[in-house]
């Protein structure tokens, strides 16, 4: 069975925990409580299987606290990660600048490909869902950007996340196949 580790990162109060719970079908949290360090959610998704082998896949979703005081822990969180989801609150202008730092630390410095990264512009309930694409600085503007609004269209973000999980599993599977071939030859 293939396993993949995916990090949920981004600024404080961007909606990472709410999205993580929704996408992994974990418990609902009704009041805001900042994540201290990291929460690890383990789950399987029946819609995601390994490359034409039909074998199941296990995921670890690491819901990382957005407070900069945890920056010293980031190297440990990043170790052996296969993908990074950067979540930001689309209604807070300062988040656009902050996600550049998250991208630099968690994607560029880890030498992950842009295909291993997903950018989610999260809209909190009652905020209205302005689907206009925010003005993202390069290289963020090359990433896949998805809007999420759990109030208006929860299934859209679920379907986009499943597509993302499939691409991560394909990447993990191809990497494993290359490794096995290098051992054989």
UniProtKB/Swiss-Prot annotation:
Q: Where in the cell is it found?
A: Cell projection, Cilium
Q: Which domain of life is it from?
A: Eukaryota
A Gene Ontology molecular function term of the record: GTP binding
Provide the Gene Ontology terms for cellular component: cilium; endomembrane system; intraciliary transport particle B
Which keywords label this protein? Cell projection, Cilium, GTP-binding, Nucleotide-binding
| Record Pfam families | Roc
**Positions annotated to bind GTP:** 10-17, 63-67, 123-126
Asked if the keyword Nucleotide-binding belongs to this entry, the reply reads yes
Q: Which GO terms describe its biological process?
A: intracellular protein transport
Record text on subunit structure and interactions: Component of the IFT complex B, at least composed of IFT20, IFT22, IFT25, IFT27, IFT46, IFT52, TRAF3IP1/IFT54, IFT57, IFT74, IFT80, IFT81, and IFT88. Interacts with IFT88. Interacts with CFAP61.
Question: What does this gene product do?
Answer: Small GTPase-like component of the intraflagellar transport (IFT) complex B.
Q: Which family does it belong to?
A: Belongs to the small GTPase superfamily. Rab family.
- Name listed for the protein in its UniProt record: Intraflagellar transport protein 22 homolog
Species, as recorded: Bos taurus
């Amino acid at each position: 069975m293939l396993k993949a580790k995916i990090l949920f990162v981004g600024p404080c109060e961007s909606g990472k925990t709410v999205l993580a719970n929704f996408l992994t079908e974990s418990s609902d949290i009704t009041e805001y409580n900042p994540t201290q360090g990291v929460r690890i959610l383990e789950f399987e998704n029946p819609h995601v299987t390994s490359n034409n082998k039909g074998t199941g896949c296990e995921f670890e979703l690491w819901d990382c606290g957005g407070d900069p005081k945890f920056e010293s822990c980031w190297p440990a969180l990043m170790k052996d990660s296969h993908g990074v989801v950067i979540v930001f609150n689309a209604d807070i202008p300062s988040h656009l600048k902050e996600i550049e730092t998250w991208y630099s630390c968690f994607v560029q410095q880890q030498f992950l490909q842009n295909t291993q990264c997903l950018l989610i512009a999260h809209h909190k309930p009652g905020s209205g869902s302005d689907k206009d694409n925010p003005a993202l600085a390069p290289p963020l503007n090359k990433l896949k950007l998805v809007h999420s609004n759990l109030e208006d269209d929860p299934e859209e973000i679920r379907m986009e996340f499943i597509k993302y999980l499939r691409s991560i599993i394909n990447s993990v599977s191809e990497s494993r196949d290359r490794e096995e071939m290098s051992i054989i030859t």
